[in-house]
Amino acid sequence: MGYKVAVVGATGNVGREMLGILDERKFPADEVVALASRRSVGVDVSYGDRTLKVKALEHYDFSDVDICLMSAGGAVSKEWSPKIGVAGAVVIDNSSAWRMDPDVPLIVPEVNADAAAGFTKKNIIANPNCSTAQLVVALKPLHDKATIKRVVVSTYQSVSGAGKDAMDELFSQTKAVYTNDELINKKFPKRIAFNVIPHIDVFMEDGYTKEEWKMMAETKKILDPKIKLSATCVRVPVFVGHSEAVNIEFENPISADEARNILRNAPGCLVIDKQEPGGYVTPYEAAGEDATYISRIREDATVENGLVLWCVSDNLRKGAALNAIQIAECLINRKLLTAKKKAA
């Protein structure tokens, strides 16, 4: 018996990606339903070679839904995820609404799949922040080998992480530069075309942004609360793909060659690390791919037991949609979820 899957936020960047990945991976779904707000009702979205008509979230009966992939933002998730969970569906939420709730597992399957069993408290599982997901995939195998003490990470995050309007703004501003038209800032506080913005999400009292706080708090919850981490998150004029420069200090010695070999055999990682021009991965190559790509692995001579690396991933896939579907697959493979009997 297959599963009934509802995708909430099906008209957004991540929702559309979820529908595509469900089809690509041949997820065992007998039925897939596309849901969104009332203003999107009737919109067509693609699910493989099929077209789904978007239905209204507000009027949908979730009693026979097995899995709800929620990608409609934090406010919608706060209101609807508990109701959907009570109706008996497992909600896998892509927003930040539930990530730090102690009764909600925060899961990256390559890193902490065992924690997924805790979903039964609220029938909700949280998907991490896009920049966190690729970071912990790269850190986990190294942490297992040499125990990480401290991480300093600088991110180079694409505009798709801020939604379709942000992608449109980058496109229109880039075009405006060449046509000598006025550049209009709506989504970003400063122009994004041919620029970088060291500010993602709101500022916190300590001077960090909320995006930076998410990376620090989520990495501790997923990987190890003892790890010290500092993040600087930067928006760059790239459409898809997040990049990170990561400096790691370990408790125990680990060489660059050891790290390279460990990461080559780690789930979700793909090492492309040649010390030559072009022997590394950029966000352009990572777009549309599932892996977390790791390059520029080298020892840091300024700190004992230090390494530096570069990691890149498609933020709409591993950073969001793919990770959510991998969580659903994890529940099924571990027999933590069985399909409801549907009315004939």
Per-range role (PLM):
Residues 1-192, 228, 256, 261, ...:
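N-terminal Rossmann-like NAD(P) cofactor-binding subdomain of oxidoreductases
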Residues 39, 240-243, 288:
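A short, glycine/Asx- and small/polar-enriched loop/turn
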Residues 123-134, 207-216, 221, 319-323:
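A glycine-rich, Thr/Ser-enriched phosphate-binding loop motif common to dinucleotide/cofactor-binding enzymes
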Residues 178-183, 214-218, 229-234, 245, ...:
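Glycine-rich, charged/polar anion/phosphate-binding loops
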Residues 192-239:
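Oxyanion-binding "anion nests"
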Residues 231-232, 237-267:
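Internal helical hairpin/lid segments
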Residues 234-237, 313-318:
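Glycine-rich phosphate/pyrophosphate-binding beta-alpha loops
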Residues 253-287:
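Terminal hydrophobic/aromatic helix or amphipathic segment near a protein terminus
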